[in-house]
């Protein structure tokens, strides 16, 4: 019973967090990719 409840709770949270989280990860993925590119170039002089 606990497992069923846990799955239902997680499933309910997944769709709710997936909707508002989808746009964020999409934007974040692009930002991270861009950051990685800029970071690599900056890493040369801005290693740490």
UniProtKB/Swiss-Prot annotation:
Q: Which residue stretches does the UniProt record annotate as biased composition, category Basic residues?
A: 30-48
Query: InterPro entries per the record?
Result: SASP_SspP
Q: GO terms for biological process? A: asexual sporulation; sporulation resulting in formation of a cellular spore
Q: Where is the composition biased (Basic and acidic residues)?
A: 1-12
One Pfam family hit: SspP
Primary localization class, coarse: other
**What switches on its expression?**
Expressed only in the forespore compartment of sporulating cells.
Q: Where in the cell is it found?
A: Spore core
This protein's UniProt keywords: Sporulation
For the keyword Transport, the answer is: no
This chain belongs to which protein, by name? Small, acid-soluble spore protein P
Q: In the record, what lineage is assigned to the organism producing the protein?
A: Bacteria, Bacillati, Bacillota, Bacilli, Bacillales
**Name of encoding gene:** sspP
């Amino acid at each position: 019973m606990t497992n069923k409840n846990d799955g239902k709770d997680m499933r309910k949270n997944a769709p709710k967090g997936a909707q508002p989280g989808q746009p964020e990860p999409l934007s974040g993925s692009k930002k991270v990719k861009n950051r990685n590119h800029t970071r690599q170039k900056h890493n040369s002089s801005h290693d740490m």
